[in-house]
From Swiss-Prot:
Belongs to the crotamine-myotoxin family. Expressed by the venom gland. This is Myotoxin-3. It comes from Crotalus viridis viridis (Prairie rattlesnake). The lineage of its organism: Eukaryota, Metazoa, Chordata, Craniata, Vertebrata. Keywords: Antimicrobial, Disulfide bond, Ion channel impairing toxin, Myotoxin, Neurotoxin, Potassium channel impairing toxin, Secreted, Toxin, Voltage-gated potassium channel impairing toxin.
Length: 45
């Protein structure tokens, strides 16, 4: 999210958010999402 990026950027690790299948294939719609970290919570890695 843009707000998250402004508040402190992205942090590792990534998390997978899966949504219910929206097609006839029946596959879960999984997308990589960055965990939101507060500013100064993690050193530059």
């Amino acid at each position: 999210y843009k707000r998250c990026h402004k508040k402190g950027g992205h942090c590792f690790p990534k998390t997978v958010i899966c949504l219910p299948p929206s097609s006839d294939f029946g596959k879960m719609d999984c997308r990589w999402k960055w965990k939101c970290c507060k500013k100064g919570s993690v050193n530059n890695a």
